[in-house]
Amino acid sequence: VKIGAWLATESVSLLSSLVDSLLDAGSSLINLFAIYHALQPADREHRFGHGKAEALAGLAQAAFIAGSGVFVMLEAIDRLFNPKAIDNGEFGIGVMVFAILLTSILVLFQAYVVRKTGSIAIHADSFHYRVDVLVNIAVIMSLMLSSYGGFLLADPLFAGAIVIYMGFGSWKIAIKSLDDLMDKEFPDEERIKIREIAMAHPKVHDIHDMRTRRSGRYSFIQIHLEMSRELTLVEAHQI
């Protein structure tokens, strides 16, 4: 539908929405594979499981978003210096309203899934569709200003703003994915909570060498516990 709307209007802001939607479809397929792989149980060669497949998918999505953003930005710059009137603006606006309704339903469902699972891949995918909603709103404003207000520069300016937002989202997804891949430690407040839980045991005198990391939706915590030397090895192991 968006392809038809773009061909009818030749709007560069609508092109940005079209590219974003195509990117969303490709990213969702990547996520399907990544989540399936991440849910596979640990095996002999992957003792900590396969959770990092989600982070790899998130990193790939960040690259796709950045690449599509560069393409649209080049088109927007060309249209900025070569303004063009928008044709069939009403058709384009109708398509965008329809797209907003469908995408909003999907975003609400994905937000629910992310709260339940903490999936990086679905979080990245959800960002794509949230961007899609904002992009569609911006496209509607652009088409209205260009078609009815005679402000031809609205089209490339709105497209440029959309690309900047896409770039910011791409950066955030990339950082989150890299943190997971590089085994970044938990935030200080979470480490403090872990220490409090460990120290609450009456036979634990102190802890040291705490190490934490995440792999997909799984969290791993390693701690050295200091206990009385009078405890037997069996008792210490049970603690």
Predicted region positions:
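Alpha-helical transmembrane segments and adjacent TM-loop junctions that form the membrane-embedded core
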Residues: 1, 7-19, 23-239
